């Protein structure tokens, strides 16, 4: 009993520590990328090329004096950011970083991620209401309305993916893309899902919950020092999680190009032009297969690097969108969800099963 608990704790640490480190470096990447787009240098003093800037900022916030409003509900004021951070990190428990490389790869993984991401709304609502501030309360209401609305967009887009794969299990969704990634037959759905992900994570141009010109800093206006770090980590943790989920649903997750196929392709070219002989190929092929293909450690690293690379590209798109587009009005944001995205998704939900059924490729467990 105790042994299994210790193993579970080790698994949680092995997943969350790299995730938190990745979140820290996403903040640095965002600042450096936006600086490059705006012809600035960005952070470049703390550490080599500014690589330790996030840790310096975290230390600064941890050492700051914590101040709370006198009329605030102190317990809920502290509890709101903690709840938001916990639910933003719970989604990492079902992410498969490779075959059988997940804390708990159970059959309802997609449903679980949608559930815990929607529960983070309670933390934002508690934080805004308990601060006893008009700006914080209005920001929390805006954020709640936005998250609930775009949760429908994400759920509807995921439903279209499930129609192709026939499962709510993340690993099954990845393995079903060995022939072709879902982004190719479902490109419009991918675009809608990406837009919904940007809105779901309160990122520009959909960051209406913390619009500086209207709400000072939204639901986190009164929070400072350590509890502000919780909100900060929760926001960027949600960004990384949504990018990983997008790469799993549409970009094949940890699946990469078969290295043996690439090897055979280049060998056939070199052999046909007489650059190498057959004996050299057999020796090199044997060592290559033993070191890179049959080695479970190397294979696991390749899986992790693959899903990390795909997620990094999507994170860059998040940053690119933030640096390129102006903030829209809140009524435009909600109208775009309810009058454009959702009707379009409902039309696709009706159209896609008809196409799949007419070609007899609808998964059996969806019928």
UniProtKB/Swiss-Prot annotation:
Signal sequence segment: none
Catalyzed reaction equations: a ubiquinone + NADH + 5 H(+)(in) = a ubiquinol + NAD(+) + 4 H(+)(out)
GO biological process, one term: aerobic respiration
The enzyme's E.C. designation: 7.1.1.2
Domain of life, per lineage: Eukaryota
Role, per record: Core subunit of the mitochondrial membrane respiratory chain NADH dehydrogenase (Complex I) that is believed to belong to the minimal assembly required for catalysis. Complex I functions in the transfer of electrons from NADH to the respiratory chain. The immediate electron acceptor for the enzyme is believed to be ubiquinone.
This protein's name: NADH-ubiquinone oxidoreductase chain 1
Organism: Podospora anserina (strain S / ATCC MYA-4624 / DSM 980 / FGSC 10383)
Gene from which this protein is expressed: ND1
